From Swiss-Prot:
Enzyme class of the recorded protein, top EC level: hydrolase
Taxonomic lineage: Bacteria, Pseudomonadati, Pseudomonadota, Alphaproteobacteria, Rhodospirillales
PROSITE patterns: PEPT_TRNA_HYDROL_2 (PS01196)
Site positions for Stabilizes the basic form of H active site to accept a proton: D91
GO terms for biological process, alphabetical: protein quality control for misfolded or incompletely synthesized proteins; rescue of stalled ribosome
Job of this protein: Hydrolyzes ribosome-free peptidyl-tRNAs (with 1 or more amino acids incorporated), which drop off the ribosome during protein synthesis, or as a result of ribosome stalling.
Keyword Cytoplasm: yes
A GO CC term assigned to this protein in UniProt: cytoplasm
Protein name according to UniProt: Peptidyl-tRNA hydrolase
Keywords associated with the record: Cytoplasm, Hydrolase, RNA-binding, tRNA-binding
Positions of region (Disordered): 182-227
Homology family: Belongs to the PTH family.
Amino acid sequence: MRLVVGLGNPGPEYERQRHNVGFMAVDLLHRRYGFGPWKRRFQGLTAEGSVAGEKVLLLKPATFMNLSGQAAGEAMRFYKITPDQVLVFHDELDLPPGRVRVKRGGGHGGHNGLRSLDDHVGKDYWRIRIGIGHPGSKERVTGWVLSNFAKAEEQWLEPLLDALVAEAPLLVAGEPEKYASRIALLTQPPKPPKPPKPPKDGAKETAGKGTEAETAKPPGPAAGRTG
């Protein structure tokens, strides 16, 4: 069995906050793969189901972020799950918005949810780090993570969550490297169009007659670009 934990804070007022992107990922997993109903257990909400034939327990701790490890530790002890079978979706300040990294073990990087998990679970669990970007100064971090995603951020957030969930079979099958590669491929921003090739000598001569002058003009700004 795999234990898949989403980190976040319980309550509707926190639903769209950056700190709750782990909850968002687990909620989408629950819907897409037809998990059973949410039940209150282990100081949180749990749901049982399977992904690609692998039995999975979803967990959203109801302890608030700083005590997330208490809920995960209880579930692990009950089901005799080892740390390497635990997958944690969480927000990551040190990654640009929309970037994802998957790693096993490591430090908490100041993330209080991970700090609590380290205390109750150990450090040898898998982390799916979902980049939310950094506000620029330490003083602004709390306000940043506890603020809602802006409307403009939905352009990368929704496709990213879709990709995280669509490729989940790779993750639960124990292929995190392939999972991370697929996420990067599916969420790669479109490349800007290449500049037009310079016209050949013959085209230069006819351009002066007004027949191809228009096609020789450089294109305007690419649609959708914000600079």
